[in-house]
Design a protein with these regions (language model features):
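Glycine-rich active-site loops that engage anionic ligands at enzyme catalytic sites
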Residues: 81-138
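Loop/turn positions that initiate beta-strands
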Residues: 144-149
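Anionic-ligand-binding alpha/beta catalytic cores of soluble enzymes and soluble regulatory domains
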Residues: 5-90
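Conserved "cap/hinge" positions at secondary-structure junctions
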Residues: 135, 151-153
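Short, Lys/Arg- and Gly-enriched loop/turn segments at beta-strand edges
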Residues: 154-162
Length: 162
């Protein structure tokens, strides 16, 4: 894991930067699947916007990034939305978001860590080494590609299990 410095409106951020591999997820965020007749983000985005997080301009799906051997834990997300009723197929869910950056082929893309809380998302097991990111469109990216992910250390704790 490396540290990179970025300037924000208030103070420099020392981003934690890790290498990861883009892998296939459940394939429900971006479009219809066996479990959902629609893309989940299509339903969720308007709710997130109404609650203060506008994802306009971001790709309508998630990048699933395998961070092994690292794991992550959200400790102070920028947004947490509780009891989001976006489907009648299961009970409301909680979601948290924290800013991040994805670097692919030396180009940096703004993004958000997208974290459906596992305690409210019982249908899908989420590996603690798998980071889901909603980013601006990244031309040419595909499964198996290596990326770097930068996360805010005050908001996301990254560790390497012993």
């Amino acid at each position: 894991m490396q540290e990179a410095v970025s300037m924000s409106d208030t103070q420099p951020i020392k981003w934690n930067t890790m290498r990861g591999i883009v892998i296939q997820g459940y394939r429900v965020a971006s479009g219809p699947s066996r479990d959902y007749p629609y893309g989940t983000l299509d339903r969720q985005r308007p709710i997130f916007k109404a609650r203060g997080l506008d994802l306009e301009g971001y790709f309508n799906g998630t990048l699933n990034i395998d961070l092994r051997p690292f794991t992550f834990k959200l400790i102070k997300p920028e947004f947490t939305f509780r009891n989001v009723e976006w489907t009648d197929l299961h009970p409301p869910e909680n979601f948290s978001f924290s800013r991040c950056k994805v670097i692919y082929k030396e180009i940096e893309y703004e993004g958000w860590v997208y974290y459906p809380h596992p305690e409210t998302k019982l249908r899908h097991f989420q590996d603690p080494s798998l980071l889901e990111v909603i980013a601006h469109p990244i031309p040419g990216i595909k499964y198996g590609d290596e990326v770097q992910v930068c996360v805010h250390p005050d908001r996301i704790e990254v560790s390497k299990p012993t």
